[in-house]
Amino acid sequence: DGNWTEPTIIHADNWEISGCPVNGPRVVAEGNTLLVGWFTAAKGAAKVQYSFSSDAGATFGAPITVEGQGIIGRVEVALLDEQTGIAAWMETTKQGTFLMAARIDSGGKMGKRWEIGAMDSGRKSGFPQLEVLGDRVYFAWTEVNGETNQVRTVFLPKAAF
């Protein structure tokens, strides 16, 4: 109806921050389906969470959680259909920092985790982007090389997810 609704808590993870968050949420909507992703460090544990809504954001399902020692966040989301989406995030391992992605569904399941590409973990690398176009899933991010930065892109077949 063109009017703002009252804010809704997606998940009460009780994360308290004392400053400006760099790691904001992402949302994608198609019809009444919403997919939201966010970083949290509640109770000192860094993780990213994703949640679906099938009623235009009135309610949300239980979060799908990605945990690990090196979760940085900088989440991104895309919908494949009303029940499935793609979740992306940054994660640091012993081998470096990577843009990761996986298929998720509204039933709480996560598919294979894909290592999309190496990234710089600093703020200069910005926030990765994700788009589903036709039968391809495109990813883009800033590659930081000293004083020179460039945008990197890669795509995977939608069927891979």
Task: Label the predicted regions.
Residues 1-161:
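Extracellular, repeat-based ectodomains that mediate carbohydrate processing or recognition
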